[in-house]
């Protein structure tokens, strides 16, 4: 049985046509959260057989396989350490939105991560936006002041 819930209801199967979802995990003890995405299926190219290789140019086929979404608990190392230490029962696993293309899932994830300022807010486990790592990015008072100036300018 999956630990995911959508609008309070348990999710055991993906909605028809959905590519993936954006989720929020919440630590029920300290209320820290994590916003991420998960695809329902993985896709890879099927290796060509020797016969196909020797035949010359052959179009490769793609294989779709269900991902580990039912058991998935996020990709943040700090989050996963907390889940191991505190127990999965101390976290809620909530699907926020479904996307019906890869682009929709990615857009939803990054949009929500920016909207909730997950990199600068200590209430979030996130250390990246989308798949981009901000390795050299440190949140300083100067950076926050610059962001406030831009925010004020844009209204």
Language model segments and positions:
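Structure-specific nucleic-acid interaction/processing domains
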Residues: 1-155
